Amino acid sequence: MSLWLEHFLTGYFQLCGLVCGWSGSRLGRLLSSTFLVLILIELVGEIETYFTEENPDNESVPAYFAKVIMGVNMAYKMIHAWIALSALFECRRFRYLLEELPPVKATSFIYRHLILEIILFACNAFLVLSEYTIRGIYLENLRYAYSLQAVRARYLQMMVLVDRLDGKLEQLHHRVISGSSDYKTLRLDYAHLAKVTRSLSHLFGLSLLLLNVLCLGDWIIVCNVYFMVAYLQVLPATLFLFGQVMFVVCPTLIKIWSICAASHRCVSKSKHLQQQLKDLPGQTPVERSQIEGFALQIMQDPIQIDVCGIYHLNLQTLAGMFFFILEALVIFLQFVSLVRT
């Protein structure tokens, strides 16, 4: 990874409040920690205001759907606050991951997602300015846009580390197929990568679980807007509104698909490495025993990213998530048909 890209990602993640103290100097860590504390104070203030302010007793159906959308927006801020808080306490563990997974050559995968992140930032800025021009609301939309951008950047933060892990697995695979006979060193290197993968799962597991739950929240917003436009007719069916709705749900789906695909590549390379070992011809019984022991180690300790012990990140998980969303949409449409009648 080029130096400018590494510095850009470092600054971007610090600006979003996702990391603490990437800098090696004490002053850099102090400034980063102070910035995180300021973000936490602001977010906690917004959350407290949301739960303590008195809302008017408006029992109309449009008001109910508007409150649901506001609730999902607040969920983004709450998760952003939790990520910033965990960044303060998990600073050393994150630095350990960065040391164990140093920058590698930047791939097209990272550049594509960097471009996507820039596009999301531009769309966020455009929507904030549009809302200010139309309704005169600026600060509240800016706060929500900041939390939305930061929470979605959590996917990119993990994808960078998964891409580095993928590069390490690729190097190990090349050493095996090139004829390296030092199986003891190869086994130690693989065990180290498996340990790093577990650390990666522990650090990002809960975040990924919450972000995947937020994906369902994004679909709730889409369904509520659809209901308010198609049946209650309290919102105009404009192209701008359609663009806002797509901006809510599409980037999240793209990021979930990307992180699942990146994790699936690591799992596939681990299985391919095991198959390559089985196909290697053993010159002596001792060498054959070492090869079989290495293959058994890979089978017993596979490279896979665990999400809070509930599921593993791979393309099968992605398919299950999409089927769950489709079932939820079917239930919603049935509910809409009942309300309409």
From Swiss-Prot:
Main location: membrane
Extracellular-side segments: 23-30, 90-113, 224-233, 340-341
Localisation: Cell membrane
Topology of this chain in the membrane: Multi-pass membrane protein
GO terms for MF: ligand-gated monoatomic ion channel activity; taste receptor activity
GO biological process: chemosensory behavior; detection of chemical stimulus involved in sensory perception of taste; male courtship behavior; monoatomic ion transmembrane transport; signal transduction
Keywords: Cell membrane, Membrane, Receptor, Transducer, Transmembrane, Transmembrane helix
Pfam families for this protein: 7tm_7
Function statement: Probable gustatory receptor which mediates acceptance or avoidance behavior, depending on its substrates.
Protein name: Putative gustatory receptor 9a
Lineage: Eukaryota, Metazoa, Ecdysozoa, Arthropoda, Hexapoda
Gene name as annotated: Gr9a
